[in-house]
Amino acid sequence: MAGENHTTLPEFLLLGFSDLKALQGPLFWVVLLVYLVTLLGNSLIILLTQVSPALHSPMYFFLRQLSVVELFYTTDIVPRTLANLGSPHPQAISFQGCAAQMYVFIVLGISECCLLTAMAYDRYVAICQPLRYSTLLSPRACMAMVGTSWLTGIITATTHASLIFSLPFRSHPIIPHFLCDILPVLRLASAGKHRSEISVMTATIVFIMIPFSLIVTSYIRILGAILAMASTQSRRKVFSTCSSHLLVVSLFFGTASITYIRPQAGSSVTTDRVLSLFYTVITPMLNPIIYTLRNKDVRRALRHLVKRQRPSP
């Protein structure tokens, strides 16, 4: 049955924002501008953490990996979104193209969850167990955490994509979204959704709620350590360093939780798309801005890089 559907189903149709024609033009330019800023900002973070000796610590190593994920993440989604915004009609996407986009989307989303958790662990060890920092966060340990993040994403994506795209679909279904996200595609399956729905809910709990709980636990302990510091200046420095990561975590996990955990019965297609647009397009742009504006080391490295590029008088 599934095989027959796949051979007679050459493409899905992505609704995009074709039902909101008045917004398509303005949204096109906003998304394009945000995408360009995202590419520039994350590329700059990668460059700074690579060339600046002051940023060769585990914290900035994880930040560089996060920027790499953000670059791939937006590039998987935004170009097709721009094409959809430039068309007055739903755009076709092949069965294989939809599966590939979802696969990459899941790999990068899960990897980002794991990386944000690793960054919280880095801050916890640096502040609460400084004497063990070089041991617990050695280069080998950091590489292992990053490798595990990617491997976890690959395994999860392979499982979900295999389950979802083995289901039967009706002819030429319209996905009420601007990307091949898990829930909108899964809802279009004509039968056999139960196992995939259980898999998605399990993954949501494991990769959103558990990492978020670990991050919150880390920061509760960090807050206790900050309050125990005698020096006001030390407290401000530590809080400034941690607040950037906390803000990024709140943006990412907040919008992802609302999208995947809230009851679907009362949700609307427009609300789903707006929320997804925020965490897939807006958040990757905000991350480098947040880290640059709120982190003195990054700002200092940026000024130093600019001075080096200026021609001598």
Curated annotation (Swiss-Prot):
Residues 1-25, 76-100, 162-198, 260-272 are extracellular. InterPro entries: GPCR_Rhodpsn, GPCR_Rhodpsn_7TM, Olfact_rcpt. This is Olfactory receptor 10P1. It comes from Homo sapiens (Human). Glycans are attached at residue 5. SUPFAM superfamilies: Family A G protein-coupled receptor-like. GO terms for molecular function: G protein-coupled receptor activity; olfactory receptor activity. Odorant receptor. PANTHER family: OLFACTORY RECEPTOR. It comes from the Eukaryota. One of its GO terms (biological process) is detection of chemical stimulus involved in sensory perception of smell. It holds the Pfam family 7tm_4. Belongs to the G-protein coupled receptor 1 family. GO terms for cellular component: plasma membrane. Residues 47-54, 122-140, 219-238, 294-313 are cytoplasmic. Its main location: membrane. It is found in: Cell membrane. It is a multi-pass membrane protein. The chain crosses the membrane at residues 26-46, 55-75, 101-121, 141-161, 199-218, 239-259, 273-293. Keywords: Cell membrane, G-protein coupled receptor, Glycoprotein, Membrane, Olfaction, Receptor, Sensory transduction, Transducer, Transmembrane, Transmembrane helix.
